[in-house]
Amino acid sequence: MDTPASLNDLQHTTLAIVLAGGRGTRLGPLTNKRVKPAVHFGGKYRIIDFALSNCLNSGIRRIAVVTQYKAHSLLRHVQRGWGFLRGEFNEFIDLWPAQQRVEGAHWYRGTADAVFQNLDIIRSIRPKYVVVLAGDHIYKMDYTRMVMDHVESKADCTVGCIEVPRMEAVAFGVMHVDEERRVTGFVEKPADPPAMPGHPDIALASMGIYVFNADYLYSLLEDNITSVATDHDFGKDIIPRVVTSGNAIAHPFSMSCVSSDPSVEPYWRDVGTIDAYWAANLDLASTIPSLDLYDRNWPIWTHQEQLPPAKFVRDLNGLQGTGTNMIVCGGCVISGSQISRSVLSSNVVVNSFCNIAEAVLLPQVSIGASCRLRKVVIDRGCHIPDGTVIGEDPVRDGERFYRTDSGVVLVTAEALKRQTAR
């Protein structure tokens, strides 16, 4: 394979495919109405904005978003917020919903099948390289560095990887690599993840980011679709096949992580559980967060609603609304309440005499007067009645709402309706 003549050539011969059709069942009721990449994050963003922004900032401007499960809010968000690329310059973000495009008339049966069913579109774009991305992780990464590493190493497939605590690796593909970063073993979501040599408590996990030579990817997908014993999945089928019969190279996240502070540990989060989602949101409210949303050299783009500025006001008794270590978005009004280490999304209203800590409030949440809330995620559009207390009585919380083993409480409109019906 010839090395591209320039970085510009590399960027213009790469197609990024963002997989955004999964149910996200580990997020519980939070994904009952929306696909996981469409879930709000960090106050003003959607989860998918991080993968799309990475593409844009990396100079990769030919992007496809593959959708299936409850995709309406995701499709609307991408159409409204990401329609600024110029087709006349061969820039685009295409939406590829499941359409039963191939013989057999079935929906996407797995991540690999989702790409296979769009092979005719991919071939018409004529990329040299295809970057396959999960649309549900939080991180900043220069994909062009990874593509360049792929080309320079003469790999058939390059797999993004990161070191994680061994027992957390049960949710990921786990890799073995040799001294030259060649992948020699790969197992998807093992019950007992193998440790890295010399590091018994650490495993090398796949980030769900792959770079393929386009022609090689086509042949892999065409072979996979005819296999009897297959889940049509990249992690379960395609990557193990490359490891055994091709040249798969590991690409450590540290090689292409984008950070405004090189001394900070590379930040990547799978927000696939309520606990992880809550913690990653609150990471952003830290004094010096590991993920810098204020880096003008690598901005996170999103749909910008036209909203009034946030404000803190005194209530009728003169009590001042205050907040520390928190993110507050446009349209928010905080009246005479104390809030700490929290994320308030757009159009959140907090009435007087409340005490709120370690809370993630999604858009259009309204908090009644005299509420005490701690360690909560409150879904979009919920109204919390006056005097509500959450986060102080584990038994009571579990009876009323979805509560994780670590004590994070998810409040949804459906759960609130059940309370009023009793």
Curated annotation (Swiss-Prot):
Reaction it catalyzes: alpha-D-glucose 1-phosphate + ATP + H(+) = ADP-alpha-D-glucose + diphosphate
Subunit description: Homotetramer.
Gene3D superfamilies given in the database record: Hexapeptide repeat proteins, Spore Coat Polysaccharide Biosynthesis Protein SpsA, Chain A
Protein role: Involved in the biosynthesis of ADP-glucose, a building block required for the elongation reactions to produce glycogen. Catalyzes the reaction between ATP and alpha-D-glucose 1-phosphate (G1P) to produce pyrophosphate and ADP-Glc.
Keyword Cell division applies: no
Listed name of the protein: Glucose-1-phosphate adenylyltransferase
One Pfam family cited in the UniProt record for this chain: NTP_transferase
Organism the protein comes from: Paraburkholderia phymatum (strain DSM 17167 / CIP 108236 / LMG 21445 / STM815) (Burkholderia phymatum)
Family as reported in the entry's similarity comment: Belongs to the bacterial/plant glucose-1-phosphate adenylyltransferase family.
Gene name, Swiss-Prot/TrEMBL: glgC
GO BP terms: glycogen biosynthetic process
Keyword list, A-Z: ATP-binding, Carbohydrate metabolism, Glycogen biosynthesis, Glycogen metabolism, Nucleotide-binding, Nucleotidyltransferase, Transferase
Domain of life: Bacteria
Molecular function as annotated in GO: ATP binding; glucose-1-phosphate adenylyltransferase activity
Transmembrane segment boundaries: none
InterPro entries documented for this protein: ADP-Glc_PPase (IPR011831), ADP_Glu_pyroP_CS (IPR005836), GlgC_bac (IPR023049), GlmU/GlgC-like_hexapep (IPR056818), NTP_transferase_dom (IPR005835), Nucleotide-diphossugar_trans (IPR029044), Trimer_LpxA-like_sf (IPR011004)
Enzyme class: transferase
Assigned EC number: 2.7.7.27
